[in-house]
Amino acid sequence: PYPYGRWWLGEDRGLKANHNYSKQVKELKDFFEISKANMFNENSMNLKSVAMKPVFEGQTTVYLYADDEKEIVDGITFLKGYGIDKIVIVGATESESQLNFIKENNIAVVVKQPYRFPQSTDSDPMETFEIAKKMLDQGILVSIDPTGTASARVSIRNLPFYAGSFSSYGIDKEIALSMITKNPSEILGIDENYGTLEVGKSATLFVSKGDALDIISNNIIHAFI
């Protein structure tokens, strides 16, 4: 649903309350309860419940899409209530007041790419660039979600430049690079084979005459896949 009042219909422009929130939470809770009850039933025809088994057993990560404080706290609390610890937040744009909470629960964050408008009309225009540094300063594992631009091809092309843009707001270049290499590998659980240049790991190497994280000066001259 549209989060703000639809001014073209005469509604107030401010944020709207979700009057279906309690109902939606109950539906989600019912689904989790049914799934947990059926996950050991080998004859169950409820494929959704069967698919939840690795989630409850800690084999699969849950990606929680949440931006504001209440979403984050409610979402994490809900999942923790079912013994689910492998949680990654996607978004967390307005999470500054809950960074300690995120850190205490040992949760990684995939932040939104910075080439976008602020989350809210009254948000700091620089929040999109600064939130990643605030998370890293708290010791939170951070990566970047490249989606949100015109196409998947453009998003992937811009990924190194997103990291470069974050580095312009106080993040060390090496740490910014890790946001698109080492950190996502750890979040995905594939860091034994990918993410860093170490003996025995797989890697794609490239050589750039300019800054590979800078949209203007980068100039890739060699690539080894």
Where are the predicted features?
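Polyanionic/metal-chelating signatures
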Residues: P1-K86
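Stable alpha-helical elements in mature extracytoplasmic
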Residues: Q24, L28, E71, Q98, ...
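Amphipathic coiled-coil/heptad-repeat helices and related helical stalk/stem segments
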Residues: K48, E71, S95, E127-T128, ...
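Short acidic active-site motifs
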Residues: A51, S97-Q98, I131, G195
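Glycine-enriched alpha-helix->loop->beta-strand junction motifs that scaffold or abut catalytic
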Residues: L79-K86, K103-V110, G139-L141
